[in-house]
């Protein structure tokens, strides 16, 4: 009921509950990726969902905690941990695509980001997008790698207020 998956008067599934029941993920993650698809902010929704299902990409080494915190603040958006992760992941991913793994590894090291966590997020994003295709929330043939911010599925990817609403729904 906390995910609005049951009706108030009966134990029948709502439309959302029906779709959540088909996904092999926690309901809160399923709800986030479905709403991300519905509200055309797939890319950030997938990143947030993937980060919720894995470890945080931010490292906080005991001997360099202050520098790590400063680095994290550089990625910060609207005091939101989730949106901060979206920004850090997006920069790492763009650098990896443009300049390769070596540059992305340096970026991760310099910014106190866990490469393992970033790769896990990347893999989970692919899995979650495939699930959305399977249940019809993304078109057949959807390719996450080609779905930039200008694609139909990401028309609202930069709308911070909408992203926060999707997170809180």
Outline where the language-model segments fall.
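Second RecA-like catalytic domain
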Residues: 1-169
């Amino acid at each position: 009921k906390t995910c609005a998956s049951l009706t108030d008067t009966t134990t029948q599934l709502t439309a959302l509950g029906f779709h959540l029941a088909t996904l092999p993920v926690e309901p809160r993650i399923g709800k986030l990726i479905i709403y991300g698809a519905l509200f055309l902010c797939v890319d950030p929704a997938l990143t947030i969902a993937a980060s919720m299902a894995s470890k945080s990409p931010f490292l906080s080494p005991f001997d360099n905690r202050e520098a790590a915190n400063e680095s994290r603040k550089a990625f910060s958006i609207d005091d939101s941990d989730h949106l901060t992760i979206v920004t850090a992941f997006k920069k790492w991913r763009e650098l990896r695509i443009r300049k390769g793994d070596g540059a992305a590894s340096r970026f991760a090291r310099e910014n106190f980001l866990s490469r393992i966590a970033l790769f896990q997020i990347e893999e989970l994003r692919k899995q979650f997008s495939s699930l959305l295709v399977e249940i019809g929330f993304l078109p057949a043939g959807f390719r996450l790698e080609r779905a930039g911010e200008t694609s139909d599925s990401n028309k609202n990817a930069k709308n911070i207020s909408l992203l926060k609403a999707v997170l809180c729904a």
